[in-house]
């Protein structure tokens, strides 16, 4: 639901630029495709009975529509990117003969490129969209432009916690806003962390695969004292997680003193905590199901089946300071979105 709402917002925003010759929506959901009948888009349904493979699917679309210049995006990949930024991207793409432009060259959520047909052989080999901008720049030699790190370029909707974060930002589109209003989710922890962020002289702890850009955004937006415990950035992309090589000093400390004592100590150091707990899980060679991880993020600890994560979440819920649990986003794009939302709010008061 949220992804469809965000995709509708993105389509309407991009179409409003008047800079597209053709807009194609590739989906496996014919019912959702029918809801787009009022928009000037072509709905291209995934072939039935075939397993989905990202690279071959995108390559076939480029060939089918004879595209010279392509902007590819997942539906929920840029819920905060402004119309002005999109206009900048499309202008650059329209003026170039050889170019790749993206939000993040190392792990892209959307990418524009020209000449598209020339890129088809490389694209067809890719299993997902994360590496295609890097491939075009370094494998195919296209000149590359990536936008500066910001909430608009680094925040997307990957997890339920991202929906809670998005709901607090005034820049989301009307369809997503309406969906989240109707969803009605609340998070005491996130509300209280936002209060701490707005309070001059409060202390915040940011834990996990902390983005330097997110840390800088937090420093700009607040007048708080910030403790950063950064570990294992790139643990997935480097293959360390897959090989069981993730190491974490905090995970070792949790093992040494126990979960309760760990959180007791953390609560004495900060008035609010943003905690990417995936590093501790990976260091313990745990990777619970998405169901467990997301229920933990929402503090539905009673629905978490993995014993350590269930216990960790329950203890975090009882800490006297707010602890926002999540994945990478909570200390990267999501944190940048919270910082930007706070700046906008303070600018209006």
Which sequence ranges carry the predicted segments?
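Short phosphate-binding loop-to-helix
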Residues: 31, 35-70, 129
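Conserved alpha/beta core of the MobA/IspD/sugar-nucleotide pyrophosphorylase nucleotidyltransferase superfamily
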Residues: 127-349
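Short, high-confidence coil segments that cap the C-terminus of an alpha-helix
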Residues: 20, 67, 96-98, 201-202
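Conserved donor-nucleotide/metal-binding helix-loop-beta segment in metal-dependent transferases, i.e.
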Residues: 78-106
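Short glycine- and hydrophobic/aromatic-rich loop-to-beta-strand nucleating segment
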Residues: 108-113
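Catalytic metal- and UDP-sugar-binding loop of GT-A-like glycosyltransferases, i.e.
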Residues: 73-75
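N-terminal glycine-rich phosphate-binding loop and ensuing alpha1 helix
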Residues: 1-26, 306, 310-313
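Short, glycine-/small-residue-rich phosphate/pyrophosphate-handling segment
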Residues: 97-98, 114-139
């Amino acid at each position: 639901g949220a992804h469809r709402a965000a995709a509708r917002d993105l389509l309407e925003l991009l179409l409003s630029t008047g800079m597209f010759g053709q807009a194609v929506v590739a989906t496996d959901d014919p019912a959702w495709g029918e809801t787009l009948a009022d928009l000037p888009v072509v709905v291209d349904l995934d072939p039935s009975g075939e397993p989905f493979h990202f690279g071959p699917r995108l390559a076939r679309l480029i060939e089918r529509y004879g595209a010279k210049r392509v902007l590819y995006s997942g539906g929920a990949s840029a819920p905060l990117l402004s119309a002005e930024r999109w206009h900048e991207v499309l202008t650059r793409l329209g003026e170039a003969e050889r170019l790749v432009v993206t939000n993040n060259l190392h792990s892209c959520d959307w990418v524009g490129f020209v000449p598209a047909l020339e890129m088809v052989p490389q694209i067809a080999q890719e299993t997902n969209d994360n590496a295609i901008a890097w491939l075009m720049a370094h494998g195919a030699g296209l000149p590359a432009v990536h936008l500066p790190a910001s909430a608009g370029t680094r925040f997307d909707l990957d997890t339920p916690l991202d929906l809670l974060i998005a709901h607090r930002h005034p820049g989301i589109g009307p369809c997503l806003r309406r969906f989240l209003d109707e969803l009605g989710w609340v998070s005491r922890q996130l509300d209280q962390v936002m209060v701490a962020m707005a309070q001059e002289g409060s202390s915040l702890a940011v834990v996990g695969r902390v983005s330097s850009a997110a840390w800088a955004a937090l420093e700009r937006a607040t007048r708080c004292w910030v403790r950063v415990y950064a570990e294992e950035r790139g643990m997935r992309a480097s293959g360390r997680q897959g090989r069981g090589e993730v190491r974490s000093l905090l995970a070792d400390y949790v093992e040494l003193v126990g979960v309760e004592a760990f959180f007791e100590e953390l609560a004495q150091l900060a008035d609010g905590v943003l905690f990417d707990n995936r590093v501790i899980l990976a260091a313990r060679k745990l990777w619970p199901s998405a169901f467990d991880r997301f229920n933990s993020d929402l503090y539905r600890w009673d629905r978490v089946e993995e014993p350590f994560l269930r216990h960790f979440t329950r203890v975090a819920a009882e800490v006297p300071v707010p602890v926002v649990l999540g994945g990478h986003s909570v200390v990267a794009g999501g944190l940048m979105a919270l910082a930007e939302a706070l700046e906008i709010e303070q600018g209006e008061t």
